């Protein structure tokens, strides 16, 4: 009996560790090739459903979406409002200028680009649909600051290290038809480190 229980416990631990370390999860947002290699997984029906839900929130709060943040009236979503495309700038997504990265003097060459993620993996490794509702006036953007690999600007005794930061974005729960404010990791800088 004890051997059976031990075997079941070992199996559950293995399954949990495999699920926790999802190999599909990329380093940064917007790097996902899509589930099973598909580049687009958010169907037109889901997009329309999200648009209608965002429009309902905008009408409920009396906010058009083109002025103040649609979700700013709710304290839980206040953190998510700063990544709206109309207000976010590249420096908002940089991390190495702030603690604990101020001690890095050099930065490797960085490729900077903006993106509008439609899905991604949370910091807990859970797959989520990220809210993008352009018709309702709500779009979320992040700026990626990724190392240009192959650069040798750290000198002979260091190497480029990709730093990531956590951003809070509005997601849509399809099962419960509701919004959440969740954390995702995104690339934010590339300091040189000596090893």
UniProtKB/Swiss-Prot annotation:
Coagulogen is a gel-forming protein of hemolymph; it hinders the spread of invaders by immobilizing them. Hemolymph. This is Coagulogen. The keyword Chloroplast does not apply. SUPFAM superfamilies: Cystine-knot cytokines (SSF57501). Residues 1-20 form the signal peptide. GO terms for cellular component: extracellular region. InterPro entries: Coagulin, Cystine-knot_cytokine.
């Amino acid at each position: 009996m004890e051997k059976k229980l031990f075997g079941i416990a070992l199996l559950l631990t293995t399954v949990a560790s495999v699920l926790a370390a999802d190999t599909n999860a990329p380093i940064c947002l917007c790097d996902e090739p899509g589930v099973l290699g598909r580049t687009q997984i958010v169907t037109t029906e889901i997009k329309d459903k999200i648009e209608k839900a965002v429009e309902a929130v905008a009408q409920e709060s009396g906010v058009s979406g083109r002025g103040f943040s649609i979700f700013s009236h709710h304290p839980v979503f206040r953190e998510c409002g700063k990544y709206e495309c109309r207000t976010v700038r590249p420096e908002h997504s940089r991390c190495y200028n702030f603690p604990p990265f101020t001690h890095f003097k050099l930065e490797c060459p960085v490729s900077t680009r903006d993106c509008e993620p439609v899905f991604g993996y949370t910091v807990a490794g859970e797959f989520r649909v990220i809210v993008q509702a352009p018709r309702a006036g709500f779009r979320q953007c992040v700026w990626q600051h990724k190392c240009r690999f192959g650069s040798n600007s750290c000198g002979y005794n260091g190497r480029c290290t990709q730093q990531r930061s956590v951003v809070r974005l509005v997601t849509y729960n399809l099962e419960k038809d509701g919004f959440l404010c969740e954390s995702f990791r995104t690339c934010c800088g590339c300091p040189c480190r000596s090893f």
